Amino acid sequence: MAKVIFVLAMDVSGKIASSVESWSSFEDRKNFRKITTEIGNVVMGRITFEEIGRPLPERLNVVLTRRPKTSNNPSLVFFNGSPADVVKFLEGKGYERVAVIGGKTVFTEFLREKLVDELFVTVEPYVFGKGIPFFDEFEGYFPLKLLEMRRLNERGTLFLKYSVEKSHR
């Protein structure tokens, strides 16, 4: 099965979105582009897609939605199905890794189906009083192993790479 990788940025309290404009750093955006371009695809929810406003270039963009539309753009697919269905779809297209980029509902659905192998998390040096958490509640837990930790800039933006312990996948 393809490796499922969550790619996200958050504040230090775990919020992935806020009313603050442009809070993710240049270094995070550059790192995100490099990671997801190498993987070759991004899976996101409809709201995340609408916030981005366009398909991300050089990647197959899969938008999970209950009301799929047709697209004339070969790099954009609207998909109505479960996380397992979208992983199978991408495997059928030859992808060995799947980059899940949010939002909260999509992350939660993948967690509930225990479909996550790695997390690539950028922690930006902010604390948001209001915002959207990384995920909703779900049953169980995922023990993680830190594979990499890098400081991306002088402000203290951190990149953390975790794997989900094999016994829990």
Swiss-Prot record:
Q: For the DHFR domain, which residue ranges apply?
A: 3-169
GO CC terms of this entry: cytosol
Q: What is its EC number?
A: 1.5.1.3
One Pfam family this chain carries? DHFR_1
Q: Does the keyword Aminoacyl-tRNA synthetase apply?
A: no
Q: Which InterPro entries match?
A: DHFR (IPR012259), DHFR-like_dom_sf (IPR024072), DHFR_dom (IPR001796)
Q: Which sites bind substrate?
A: 7-8, 28-30, 54, 59, 101
Its Gene Ontology molecular function terms?
A: dihydrofolate reductase activity; identical protein binding; NADP binding
Alphabetically, which GO biological process terms does the record hold?
dihydrofolate metabolic process; folic acid metabolic process; one-carbon metabolic process; tetrahydrofolate biosynthetic process
Per UniProt, the keywords (alphabetical) are:
NADP, One-carbon metabolism, Oxidoreductase
Q: Part of which pathway? A: Cofactor biosynthesis; tetrahydrofolate biosynthesis; 5,6,7,8-tetrahydrofolate from 7,8-dihydrofolate: step 1/1
Matching SUPFAM superfamilies: Dihydrofolate reductase-like (SSF53597)
Chain sites annotated for binding NADP(+): 9, 16, 46-51, 65-67, 81, 103-105
Q: What family does the Swiss-Prot or TrEMBL record give for this protein?
A: Belongs to the dihydrofolate reductase family.
Subunit-level organization: Homodimer.
Q: What is this protein called?
A: Dihydrofolate reductase
